[in-house]
């Protein structure tokens, strides 16, 4: 039974200080997760869906999937009824789908601030920032390797972004911290600099264990044992390979009842067939095997049907984004996920552009809109992605985060209430009049149209007098304003101390490693 997290101010001492911080904290608006009141775009009919589902079962049974360097996984599959030949697992037709049936269709990920908790699945859409880039870019410093301070600044920006529901995970890779210890600092940043839900570490099973233990400090061990407080990204090594590191992290999280996104990582034409139907077949086969394995580890473990698919430039070999083929796969995979009864992850503000320019805007908009119409429930990379995922851009982060607002508005559908019908205004104004001064307009104008908090709507003369700033420059100014006004959300000092002590102990337990 899901519970409300215990009050942070009264646990582990320090309650008075926490309550004082709570009273004086500056509050930032945060929109609730999107509730989709519009239909999904279904690109496949029943015949097409059935064909792809049958082909995926054929892949699992005849071609099989590889669980590399993982004797425990092979033993689990053998016991479940699969045929194991070396590291290859051949899953009889229907077995994976039957195992997937124990996965929940929706679940709640709890945040340390209960007002920020999110439901993942059903008609909800949860938006999370960019994940994984080793580089960052801003107008002041250009392109450079990311640092821990960059990471903290992205977490701060995410916390202050109204339309962003989730703090994410590796918003950039802090290369100035040892590889084997940076996960501790990253998780701590999410826990202390934001009160939104966040993701755990997956780069080694021991780091997943550390993530769970830190959550037990933050939320309380009893609460974590009964509730989901992390959603973490498990990438499949496409085609059809499940490596031991990712599966080890999945095992840790599934055993702890923490959520995993089971996600093929596909560049079409390189890691999957060049055709949409062929790629969808592979996506479904990989997700079926991954979700089924999570249920073998712990029946009922929360999972998300993930899809990260992009196309390839056959001239250069570079991945391409915002393409119609990728959108078709996104739409089709969404239908397959809904037929399985699983939450769905895909989409994002994806682009191959090197700068936050027109290419970045076009490509990102194509995928953001496809994700909304495709029924996505959890969208990673919703803001900040640049250069094919190699770069996290500060300016693009705030520009993208601003453009998540229209997704909320579009998803709400059409207001058909008496006020929404506008008949009062039509009667008042009549033929040849104008609506600016009528009572209906005066009563509704503040909320009638979505308005950007970043983009420029001024006349040319005013825009020119103010410096003729382009979108990137406007984004830069917003980043600076947000960071200057940032204030940490309140947290019990005793919990912060316990987190710091745990991190110090873990860092002291092994030497630094940068590889």
Feature names for model-found ranges:
Residues 2-49, 57-61, 67-82, 90-125, ...:
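N-terminal intrinsically disordered, cationic/polar leader segments
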Residues 2-9, 13-29, 43-55, 63-64, ...:
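Catalytic-core signal marking the mid-to-C-terminal active-site face
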Residues 38-41, 315-322, 349-356, 384-396:
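Short beta-alpha connecting loops at secondary-structure transitions
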Residues 45, 49-56, 66, 70, ...:
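Generic structural signal for well-ordered, non-membrane alpha-helical segments
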Residues 142-373, 377:
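Helix-rich catalytic cores of soluble enzyme domains
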Residues 342-348, 378-383, 413-422:
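Acidic/polar loop patches that form or flank catalytic/metal-binding clefts of enzymes
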Residues 369-391:
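Glycine-rich phosphate-binding active-site loops on the catalytic face of alpha/beta enzymes
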């Amino acid at each position: 039974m899901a519970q409300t997290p215990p009050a942070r101010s009264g646990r582990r001492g320090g309650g008075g200080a926490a309550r004082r911080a709570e009273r004086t904290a500056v509050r930032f608006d945060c929109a609730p997760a999107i509730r989709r009141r519009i239909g999904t775009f279904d690109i496949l009919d029943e015949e097409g869906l059935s064909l792809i589902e049958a082909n995926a079962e054929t892949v699992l049974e005849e071609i099989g999937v590889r669980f590399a360097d993982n004797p425990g996984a092979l033993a689990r599959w053998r016991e479940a009824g699969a045929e194991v030949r070396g590291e290859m697992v051949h899953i009889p037709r229907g077995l994976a789908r039957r195992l997937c049936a124990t996965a929940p269709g929706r679940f709640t990920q709890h945040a340390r601030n209960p007002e920020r908790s999110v439901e993942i699945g059903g008609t909800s859409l949860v938006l999370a920032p960019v994940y994984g880039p080793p580089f960052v870019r801003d107008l002041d410093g250009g392109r450079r390797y990311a640092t821990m301070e960059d990471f903290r600044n992205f977490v701060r920006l995410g916390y202050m972004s109204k339309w962003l529901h989730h703090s994410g995970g590796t918003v950039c890779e802090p290369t100035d911290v040892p590889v084997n210890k940076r996960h501790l600092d990253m998780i701590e940043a999410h826990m202390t600099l934001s009160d939104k839900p966040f993701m755990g570490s997956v780069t080694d099973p021991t780091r997943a264990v550390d993530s769970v233990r830190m959550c037990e400090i933050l939320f309380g061990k009893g609460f974590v044992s009964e509730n989901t407080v992390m959603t973490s990204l498990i990438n499949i090594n496409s085609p059809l390979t499940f490596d031991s590191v990712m599966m080890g992290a999945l095992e840790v999280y599934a055993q702890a009842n923490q959520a995993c996104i089971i996600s093929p990582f596909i560049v079409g034409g390189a890691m999957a067939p060049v055709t949409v139907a062929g790629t969808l077949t592979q996506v479904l086969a990989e997700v079926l095997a991954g979700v089924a394995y999570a249920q073998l580890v712990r029946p009922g473990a929360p999972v998300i049907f993930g899809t990260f698919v992009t196309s390839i430039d056959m001239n250069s070999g570079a991945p391409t984004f915002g393409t119609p083929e990728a959108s078709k796969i996104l739409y089709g995979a969404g239908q397959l996920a809904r037929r399985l009864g699983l939450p769905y992850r895909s989409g994002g503000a994806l682009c191959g552009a090197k700068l936050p320019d027109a290419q970045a805007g076009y490509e990102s908009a194509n995928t953001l809109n496809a994700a909304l119409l495709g029924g996505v429930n959890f969208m990673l990379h919703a803001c900040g992605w640049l250069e094919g995922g190699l770069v996290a851009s500060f300016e693009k982060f705030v520009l993208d985060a601003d453009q998540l607002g229209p997704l909320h508005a579009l998803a709400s559908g059409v207001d058909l209430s008496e006020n929404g019908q506008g008949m009062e205004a039509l009667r008042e104004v009549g033929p040849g009049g104008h609506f600016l001064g009528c009572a209906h307009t005066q009563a509704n104008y503040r909320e009638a149209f979505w308005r950007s908090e970043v983009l420029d709507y001024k006349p040319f003369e005013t825009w020119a007098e103010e410096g003729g700033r382009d979108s990137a420059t406007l984004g830069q100014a917003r980043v600076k304003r947000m960071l200057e006004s940032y204030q940490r959300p309140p947290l019990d000092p005793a919990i912060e101390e316990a987190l710091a002590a745990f991190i110090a102990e873990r860092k002291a337990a092994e030497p630094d490693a940068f590889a």
